Amino acid sequence: MERRLIKKEMKKLLGDYIGIRLRENEFDPKGRRQLTFLDDMAHYDLAISVALQWLDPSEDLTWLEWEELKIPLHGRPIYPNRREREAMILSSYAGILMNSIPIEEVFKIYGADSSADSGTIKVPRVSSLCLSLHPFAMLTAPKAAAYARKQSVKSRKVTTNKNATSISAKEANATEWKSSQRFSDTQPKHKVT
């Protein structure tokens, strides 16, 4: 039992050390260096650790209360509510994704036209009912983007099939109407006297 606890503590300490080292090594205040995949992973790790601290209701947050007591009333920080914290977490991860995904891909996912591709066909938007809005589900955004792409392809196929069947039905009705008109023109008209 004690061995497991020591192993668990060592894992935690190593994880914390590696995370801190990554952040220290990747610190670039002037922003001259190009971001790499490791940078994105360090940002992702930081976002997840912050999210877990903020969203875990069993976490002992007495240090926040103690900090509030030391600060005078007019300078007391107002900590955001749960929804605002989730929004902050999502916006930080969205920034990471926006830096790693080309903007054209983002426009394709959401069905908007970029200025460079103004002649392309708009992609129909996926209904937001089938996508999860929970922060930890949204943190798997690349998978969500792939899912949205698949759904938009499916919806495009359905709309083209509907359009094709409606056009063929209209054409069939039009040819039927024309043939009935020709048939009525060839029939002798009977006058009732």
From Swiss-Prot:
Q: Where is the composition biased (Polar residues)?
A: 176-186
- Please give the residue ranges the record annotates as the region Disordered: 155-193
Matching entries from Pfam families are given as:
DUF5563
Q: This chain belongs to which protein, by name?
A: Uncharacterized protein C2orf80
Q: What is the lineage of its organism?
A: Eukaryota, Metazoa, Chordata, Craniata, Vertebrata
